Every structure is written in structure tokens, then in C-alpha cells.
């Protein structure tokens, strides 16, 4: 009796199952890593806005702005940082941005404090509050 060369059906099925499991695990890790990367970008942006508000805006004016309506309010940072990872700017009138600037204790457009917040995917919201 001659022996045939090749793979059995069982060997082929097992190989396909192993490859399928590997592909699923790879994509699960990739999705998780992408979300963590977006969260890091959000933290960088919030920190940049925070330091621009504290070291730039407040140092020059002795108060905080009531709104951040455009990048010109905080010219000390890269204007691209005002746009969240999904492309929605902080001042979007329709909302939907991952970034929120909430001024507090305001009088005539001059505010005594604020809160910066970013909605995160893999952890709690990232929040920075004014120093003063």
C-alpha cells in the first residue's frame, strides 16, 4: 500500500482554527491599543490647554476666559490640539467634542476658575481644574 503525501482534512481544519484565533486576538489587541493611544492624545491636549490657561492666559490677564471660542484665545499651543481624536473641535457649537471647557465664577466675561474635561475610552474622565 502506498502512502499519499499531503494534509488530512482534520489537520487543515485545525490550522484554519488556529489562524482564526490568532487573527481575532490580534485585532482585539489592536483595537485596545488604538483606544489607549487616543486616550493619551486626549491627555496631552488637556494638559497643553491647562498650562496655556495657567502660564499664558491667567499670567497675562489675572482671570480666565469665559469661553474658548477659537485657537486665538490660547495662542501658546498648537491649534490642532483643540481638536479631539475624532476631528471635533473644543468650540463645536453642536457639541460632541471629547473636550469640555467649563468656566466658573464669571463676571463680565472674566472668570475665577474653570474645569477642563476629556471623555476617555479606557479609563475615567481626565479632569484638570484651575490652580487659582
Describe each model-derived feature in a short phrase.
Residues 2-30:
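N-terminal single-pass transmembrane signal-anchor helix
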Residues 54-122:
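Extracellular/periplasmic head regions of type IV pilus-like filament subunits
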Residues 24, 28-74:
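Conserved hydrophobic/amphipathic alpha-helical signal-anchor segments
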Residues 123-132:
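Low-complexity, S/T/G/P-rich flexible repeat/linker segments used as non-globular hinges
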Amino acid at each position: 500500500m502506498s502512502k499519499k503525501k499531503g494534509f488530512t482534512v482534520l489537520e487543515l481544519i485545525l490550522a484554519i482554527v488556529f489562524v482564526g484565533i490568532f487573527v481575532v486576538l490580534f485585532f482585539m489587541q489592536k483595537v485596545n491599543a488604538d483606544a489607549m493611544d487616543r486616550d493619551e492624545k486626549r491627555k496631552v491636549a488637556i494638559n497643553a490647554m491647562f498650562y496655556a490657561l495657567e502660564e499664558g492666559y491667567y499670567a497675562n490677564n489675572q482671570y480666565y476666559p469665559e469661553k474658548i471660542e477659537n485657537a486665538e484665545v490660547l495662542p501658546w499651543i498648537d491649534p490642532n490640539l483643540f481638536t479631539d481624536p475624532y476631528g471635533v473641535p473644543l468650540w463645536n457649537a453642536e457639541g460632541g467634542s471629547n473636550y469640555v471647557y467649563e468656566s466658573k465664577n464669571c463676571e463680565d466675561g472674566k472668570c475665577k476658575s474653570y474645569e477642563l474635561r476629556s471623555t476617555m475610552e479606557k479609563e475615567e474622565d481626565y479632569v484638570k481644574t484651575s490652580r487659582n
